[in-house]
């Protein structure tokens, strides 16, 4: 930080930050709700302990960092750089004010007062339904995404729309065909810029499984960023802060490492949202891993009513990673209520088992994300999350505690007791929460308002609101 801030500002910033912390603590203690402190993450917009002071400090330091970096590089944001359309930043500034106003005026006893012919967010599955609704409507009204046209399929502008990486392919194809309605052909009017490469397709077509040279990612992605940064002014103007990439591949985070500004500055939208692998929820956005085996999106949802669900908990899956071996060691085919299998026995159907279970166990494998989480929600089965360092999808908006159960690795031996001890009243609230949240995890073609694809866009929108560019 000292490299970016002149010495004469250190004392001022220290005093200002101290005041901000004190102010936030006062506000938090005075609140009837949680006393947690939230810095400039997107989740701060939805929590009642929100402190505008922290946002102000963060924005000031971010803008100051841009200015100082350019001065040291012999350039000036007002000279030799493309001048950003003032309307773009003015729109974002207006959105910030309106969203904060909605957050501060929120009452837990009311839903959003805003009109909406399709859906009005309400209930405790949201951190703040009013602020979310206000933000979503503003996004629909003003958010514009520019998709760089450079690059050819199948590496760029294209992705596979089936199997475990289907979400990456579907998003690329929807953006390419402007199905989501946020794309602009005028880059000067854009709020964010999309780098339309597919990590899955790079590895599928260019990666040699024998040689296993991961440098192919570096060559493709670094070359692409170099091309667009020379042809257009937008990357250099913002240092990549208003650019984003999206990947559901396990190596999605690795793919960004080879371009440091992409790794540290840009919005990385990843299924594998692992904090231990430098996923930064202040700027990066998690989204769900959904396994569309054949690409068919019909009949994804279903399930019995709570009274007819005869199985307490269910899991079937291979033993890999650090968590699953622990689960299988303790529970594999050892209990009539906790049904855990490494290989599903003949005569049992995976989907039907989820649809008749009260709880679906969702342990991380090699990577933190698991397609079992959306599968459980589709089945009306309360997810039991067993993971470490995993940032849950859309957790800046959704309150996962209201429709899932979290169990730590050390609590795996006590899994049955934990689930049996959940009162029926609480289980019913969790079950109803799963039914409500399904709308936001569901895959639709074409996409529908508030579905998983629009929620991904909303996550990107929130990250863009966290950055102020001059």
Curated annotation (Swiss-Prot):
The chain crosses the membrane at residues 8-28. Residues 1-7 are cytoplasmic. It is a single-pass type II membrane protein. Its EC number is 2.4.-.-. One of its GO terms (biological process) is cell wall organization. One of its GO terms (molecular function) is glycosyltransferase activity. It is found in: Golgi apparatus membrane. It is an enzyme of class 2 (transferase). Pfam families: Exostosin_GT47 (PF03016). It comes from the Eukaryota. GO terms for cellular component: Golgi membrane. Belongs to the glycosyltransferase 47 family. May be involved in cell wall biosynthesis. This is Probable glycosyltransferase At3g07620. The lineage of its organism: Eukaryota, Viridiplantae, Streptophyta, Embryophyta, Tracheophyta.
């Amino acid at each position: 930080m000292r490299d970016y801030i002149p010495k004469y500002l250190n004392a001022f910033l220290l005093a200002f930050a101290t005041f901000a912390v004190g102010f936030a603590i006062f506000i938090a203690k005075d609140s009837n709700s949680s006393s947690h402190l939230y810095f400039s993450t997107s989740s701060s917009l939805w929590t009642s302990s929100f402190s505008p002071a922290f946002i102000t400090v963060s924005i000031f330091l971010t803008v100051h960092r841009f200015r100082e970096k350019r001065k040291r590089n012999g350039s000036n944001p007002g000279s030799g750089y493309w001048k950003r359309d003032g309307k773009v930043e003015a729109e974002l500034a207006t959105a910030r004010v309106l969203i904060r106003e909605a957050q501060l005026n929120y009452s837990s006893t009311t839903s959003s007062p805003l009109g909406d012919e399709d859906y009005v967010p309400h209930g405790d599955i949201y951190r703040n339904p009013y602020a979310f609704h206000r933000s979503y409507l503003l996004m629909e009204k003003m958010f514009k995404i520019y998709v760089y046209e450079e690059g050819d399929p199948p590496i760029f502008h294209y992705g596979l729309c089936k199997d475990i990486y289907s979400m990456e392919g579907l998003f690329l194809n929807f953006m390419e065909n402007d199905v989501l309605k946020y794309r602009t052909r005028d880059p000067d009017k854009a709020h964010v810029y999309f780098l339309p490469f597919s990590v899955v397709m790079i590895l599928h077509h260019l990666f040699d499984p024998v040689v296993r040279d991961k440098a192919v990612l570096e060559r493709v992605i670094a070359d692409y960023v170099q091309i667009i940064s020379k042809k257009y002014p937008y990357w250099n103007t913002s240092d990549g802060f208003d650019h984003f990439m999206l990947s559901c591949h396990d190596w999605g985070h690795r793919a960004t490492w080879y371009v440091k500004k992409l790794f540290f500055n840009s919005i990385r939208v990843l299924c594998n949202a692992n904090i231990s692998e430098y996923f930064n929820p202040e700027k990066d956005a998690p989204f769900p891993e959904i396994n569309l085996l054949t690409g068919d999106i019909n009949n994804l949802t279903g399930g019995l009513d709570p009274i007819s669900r005869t199985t307490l908990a269910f899991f079937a899956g291979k033993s890999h990673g650090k968590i699953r071996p622990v689960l299988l060691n303790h529970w594999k085919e050892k209990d009539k209520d906790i049904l855990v299998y490494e290989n599903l026995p003949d005569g049992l159907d995976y989907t039907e088992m989820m649809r008749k279970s009260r709880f679906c166990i969702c342990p991380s494998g090699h990577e933190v994300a698991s397609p079992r989480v959306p599968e459980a929600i589709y089945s009306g089965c309360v997810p039991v999350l067993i993971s470490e360092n995993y940032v849950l999808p859309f957790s800046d908006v959704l309150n996962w505690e209201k429709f899932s159960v979290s169990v730590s690795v050390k609590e795996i031996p006590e899994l049955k007791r934990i689930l049996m001890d959940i009162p029926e009243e609480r289980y019913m609230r969790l079950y109803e929460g799963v039914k409500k949240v399904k709308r936001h995890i569901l895959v639709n073609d074409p996409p529908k308002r508030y579905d998983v694809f629009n929620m991904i866009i909303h996550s990107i929108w929130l990250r863009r609101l966290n950055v102020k560019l001059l």
